[in-house]
Design a protein with these regions (language model features):
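Extreme N-terminal starter segment of soluble prokaryotic enzymes
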Residues: 1-4
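Short hydrophobic segments within beta-strands
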Residues: 6-8, 37, 133
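A short, glycine/small-residue-rich beta-strand->loop->alpha-helix junction that serves as a flexible
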Residues: 8-17
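Conserved N-terminal ligand/cofactor-binding loop architecture of enzyme catalytic domains
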Residues: 20, 24-95
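Short, well-ordered alpha-helical microsegments
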Residues: 44, 114-116, 140-141, 159
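Proline-aspartate-enriched helix->loop->beta-strand connector
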Residues: 98, 102-104
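Short His-centered aromatic/hydrophobic patch
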Residues: 109-112
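Active-site-proximal region of nucleotide-activated glycan assembly enzymes
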Residues: 123-168
């Protein structure tokens, strides 16, 4: 079984979660092949550096601004729509990876690749089960996308919140 784990190195928790999933899956059997890919780095090293350094700067130097941007992207707003459009554009750049690796399932631990893979499914470009591991403690609109086959959340309190966001 080929398992593709897509994440991003904004902060540290998303990639650590990916590594923990990889370790667990490998222990489950001999015929399991796991590939972890930093989706932003794969798409563009420049994009990766811009987003990760921007995130680090905002989170550490201007946390109030980071909080404001976080809130704006969690509702219908021009910024949230802009990020969604970018993810739609970048989604196609994941296709060579998906075609080469031929995953039986795709697991995501970051909202950007979650939305990208979801877009590929919506457009009918792939028909691969997509599992989203939400590494945050509360749902954010960036994590909620169409055609996600399963969500795994960090705590029971999130289940009701996810239902309120339209996830069934």
């Amino acid at each position: 079984m080929n398992i593709l784990i897509l994440s991003a190195s904004t902060g540290g928790g998303h990639m650590r979660a990916s590594k923990a999933i990889e370790n667990y899956m490998i222990q489950q059997g001999e015929n399991i092949n796991v590939e972890i890919v930093d989706s932003l780095l794969y798409i563009s090293p420049i994009l990766n550096k811009t987003i990760t350094s921007g995130y680090l700067y905002l989170a550490t130097k201007t946390p109030k601004l980071y909080g404001k941007l976080y809130d704006l992207t969690n509702k219908e707003h021009k910024l949230a729509n802009f990020v969604a459009r970018l993810n739609n554009i970048f989604a196609n750049k994941l296709m060579p990876l998906i075609e080469d690796f031929k995953p039986d399932v795709i697991i995501t631990t970051h909202p950007f690749p979650t939305e990208m893979v979801s877009r590929l499914k919506v457009k009918g470009e792939i028909n691969i089960p997509l599992i989203c591991i939400m590494t945050d403690y509360a749902p954010h609109k960036a994590w909620i996308s169409k055609d996600i086959d399963a969500y795994i959340v960090s705590n029971d309190d999130m289940v009701g919140k996810m239902v309120n966001e339209g996830v069934n």
